[in-house]
């Protein structure tokens, strides 16, 4: 008799092959049998007729580094079928750290990932100094899913150089570089899944300074990359603007050429064409190089409860901004208040003077004025701001934009924003497309998902608490791209499932999960596909000290199974916590990815890439929006 048998489900097994109807037997933590019909009974059985049965989602771009200290369920990701989460992304994290310097790492995390510093101060125990000690501390806790960690460039540079020198982007000395490389190797030998770095000007601490490593030299990056290689396993994760693609590519090329370890980077637009082509070429040649692509536009949520809305610098709003939401809403319902607010202009001078007077301010007036101007532009780009419906549509049409609604109603864009955000007792949200949204279509994502090397990534679960809510991305990847999309091409379920299971798992050497096959971990989702949806995001105050965060519920998850145990049924947690800390590469008898690409297919794709690279060399301006599709 088996521990658990799932019967009659439509199995989308994570391999990318066509779905099939069958049964799955589970014993202990693993899948013991997959068959058209299993004769033996189970101690517990689930009838999955009419339902999808998939591997549990493997989300490789999260920021639950602090939340693991107080939330064993890692919500909202666990509500969306995630059974494995990788954190330590973007070069931020909480180890290593010298006693007394914890606040610096909190300031980095708060600035980069918009996680309230007060919650981090209250919720983290800090019973570690080194990265191996950090892993030991996490391993003592219980979780609903498996957790993997990378060592981040920010804490690493701070630990070796001191936070004053590391933050000012000074070059590390040769001895400091060697020490950092040694600590990367030490971390991976202790169980870290890799090393992460941030090379984007968007990532800053709470005072506006670039995070450590943003402008680190090629020599430093090369040494840290080969710190991964020296350990013999692990993956290098980069978040980059690719502002100087040639310089960034120089050390990456050497790493990929000489190392058999992994490389992954978050890609949110199509500008880094050369890097994308480089990734596809070397993946087809057998290297573990994986660009991550979000399945929807990175979207900011503007509302009266969120961290941003277009009225934040208006005098009338500033007078009530400190009030609890219910009191604020009662005031804003008054027509006189609305008229007063809409008649005003933002008072930037007061905010600029306030910033200049701050003790820790290091910016000039000109820099602060520029930041204020950018913020105004961000909140008033009405052509790419949309009313977020229920269920939300993450590929909205032009007519859904604030600009179009304003024109249709004959009122100002600001009045449209105010009226929409006041709905549902002032909790309604406006969706602002932050990354490029050309022609009101997710064409870039469509092209990216056609790449063999691409994986689903960028949910940022646990981060951007008051402004972004993309931890639900694994759910919308299926509901939108396989079922609901109207703006263009859809993808078959088997392709989408693989992108966020087998492919993401193998990016970090987790070969024991991501497929429904005998011997694999029994991490499984049972899904009512017709009911699969995400809710309208909502604000809750459940972080330590009452900190706020946006969350998003899901419908359609009949059950989520982790290591053979049912952790969620019909959206409710069962209370079982079978998740483990992942220490390093995990093995199982699985064929390599490259064997899945036929010789003919690989040859044709490589030929396309070579042509594309030549075309890019001589026609850079013409190629940016079209070249990726030539490889799909």
Where in this protein do the model-derived segments appear?
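C-terminal cap of metal-dependent C-N hydrolases
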Residues: 369-371, 443, 447-454, 459-460, ...
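Polar, glycine-rich mid-to-C-terminal structural blocks
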Residues: 259-360
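His/Asp/Glu-enriched, well-ordered alpha-helical/loop segment
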Residues: 229, 284-288, 297, 301-322, ...
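Histidine/acidic-residue-rich catalytic or RNA/ligand-binding cores of hydrolases
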Residues: 70, 96-101, 204-208, 244-256, ...
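Hydrophobic faces of well-ordered beta-strands that scaffold small-molecule active sites
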Residues: 58-60, 85-87, 147-151, 195-197, ...
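Histidine-rich, glycine-flanked metal-binding segment
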Residues: 1-5, 10-56, 537
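Divalent-metal coordination cores built from histidine and acidic residues
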Residues: 70-186, 190-194, 619
């Amino acid at each position: 008799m088996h521990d658990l048998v799932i019967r009659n489900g439509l199995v989308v097994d994570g391999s990318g092959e066509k779905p099939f109807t069958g049964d799955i037997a589970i014993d202990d933590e693993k899948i013991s049998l997959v068959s058209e019909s299993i004769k033996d009974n189970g101690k517990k059985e689930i009838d999955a007729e009419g339902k999808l049965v998939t591997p549990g989602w493997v989300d490789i771009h999260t920021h639950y580094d602090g939340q693991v200290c107080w939330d064993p369920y890692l919500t909202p990701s666990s509500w969306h079928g995630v059974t494995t989460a990788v954190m330590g992304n973007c070069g931020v994290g909480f180890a290593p750290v010298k006693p007394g310097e914890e606040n610096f790492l909190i300031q980095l995390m708060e600035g980069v990932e918009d996680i309230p510093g007060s919650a981090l101060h209250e919720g983290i125990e800090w019973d570690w100094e080194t990265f191996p000690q950090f892993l030991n501390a996490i391993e003592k806790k219980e979780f609903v899913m498996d957790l993997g960690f990378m060592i981040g460039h920010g804490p690493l540079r701070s630990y070796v150089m001191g936070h004053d020198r590391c933050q000012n982007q000074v070059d590390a000395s040769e001895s400091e570089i060697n020490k950092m490389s040694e600590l990367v190797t030490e971390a991976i030998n202790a169980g870290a899944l890799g090393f992460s770095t941030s090379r984007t000007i968007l990532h800053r601490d709470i005072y506006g300074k670039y995070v450590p490593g943003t402008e680190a030299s090629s020599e430093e990056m090369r040494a840290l990359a080969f710190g991964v290689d020296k350990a013999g396993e692990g993956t290098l994760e980069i978040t980059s603007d690719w502002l100087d693609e040639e310089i960034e590519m120089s050390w990456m090329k050497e790493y990929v050429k000489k190392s058999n370890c992994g490389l992954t980077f978050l890609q949110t637009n199509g500008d880094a064409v050369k890097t994308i082509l480089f990734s596809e070429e070397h993946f087809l040649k057998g290297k573990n190089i994986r660009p991550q692509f979000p399945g929807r536009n990175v979207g900011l949520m503007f509302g009266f409860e969120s961290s941003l809305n277009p009225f934040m610098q208006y005098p009338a709003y500033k007078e009530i901004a400190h009030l609890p939401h219910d009191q604020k809403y009662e005031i804003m319902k008054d027509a006189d208040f609305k008229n007063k607010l809409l008649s005003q202009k933002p008072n930037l001078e007061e905010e600029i003077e306030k910033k200049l007077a701050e003790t820790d301010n290091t910016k000039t007036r000109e820099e602060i004025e520029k930041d204020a101007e950018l913020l105004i532009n961000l909140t008033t780009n009405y052509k790419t701001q949309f009313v977020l419906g229920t269920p939300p549509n993450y590929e909205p049409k032009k007519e859904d934009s604030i600009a179009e609604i304003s024109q249709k109603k004959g009122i100002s864009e600001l009045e449209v924003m105010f009226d929409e955000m006041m709905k549902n007792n002032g909790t309604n949200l406006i969706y602002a497309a932050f990354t490029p949204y050309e022609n009101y279509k997710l064409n870039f994502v469509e092209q990216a998902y056609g790449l063999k090397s691409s994986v689903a990534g960028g949910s940022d679960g646990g981060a951007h608490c008051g402004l972004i809510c993309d931890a639900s991305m694994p759910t919308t990847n299926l509901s939108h791209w396989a079922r609901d999309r109207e703006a263009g091409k859809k993808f078959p379920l088997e392709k989408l499932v693989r992108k966020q299971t087998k492919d993401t798992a193998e990016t970090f050497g987790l070969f024991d999960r991501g497929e429904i096959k005998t011997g694999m971990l029994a991490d499984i989702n049972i899904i009512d596909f017709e009911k699969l949806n995400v809710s309208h995001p909502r604000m809750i105050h459940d972080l330590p000290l009452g900190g706020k965060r946006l969350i998003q519920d899901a419908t359609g998850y009949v059950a989520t199974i982790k290591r053979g145990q049912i952790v969620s049924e019909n959206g409710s947690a069962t209370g079982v916590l079978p998740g483990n800390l992942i220490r390093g590469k995990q093995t199982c008898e699985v064929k390599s990815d490259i064997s899945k690409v036929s010789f003919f297919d690989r040859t044709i794709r490589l030929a396309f890439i070579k042509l594309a690279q030549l075309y890019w060399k001589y026609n850079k301006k013409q190629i940016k929006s079209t070249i990726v599709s030539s490889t799909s």
